[in-house]
Amino acid sequence: MNSNNKKVLVTGGASFIGSHLCEQLVQRGANVRVAENFSSGERGHLAHIECEAFEGDLLDPSFCDIATKGMEVVFHLAADHGGRGYIDSHPVECSTNMVLDGQVFRYAHRNGAEKIIFASSGCVYPTSRALIAPSYIH
C-alpha cells in the first residue's frame, strides 16, 4: 500500500501492535488517526508518534462516525479481549466485538473508506490440534 499522504484510521492504535502499526504508517508518509478508548491501550505508546488521537467508545455510533469520517483506509484492531479462557467464560461480554466490528465497517463504508483491513485474534482458532474432519470440508 502506498501510504504517502493517505488518511489512515487505526482503531485500537494505542495497543502494543496498534502503536507499532501507527509508527510504521507515519514513517511511510500516512496521516494517522487513532480511535482508542484506552481501556488497555496506553497513551505512552503514542507519545513519540505524530498522529491524531480520538478518545471514545467505538460502540457509540456518533463517535464511530466522527472517527471514520474522512479516512481513506481503516485498520480495525480494536476489540474486547482476554485470551481463550476469558472468551470461554465470558461469552456475552465478547459478543460486543460483533457489534463493534459491524459498527466500524458500517461507518467506514458510509464515510467513503477505500479499504478496511481487519485484524482478528489468535483466539478465533480452535484450541485442539485435531484436524478438521473431511466431512466438514465442501
Regions found by a protein language model. Give the residues of each.
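N-terminal Rossmann-like NAD(P)+-binding domain of SDR-like oxidoreductases, especially those catalyzing
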Residues: M1-H138
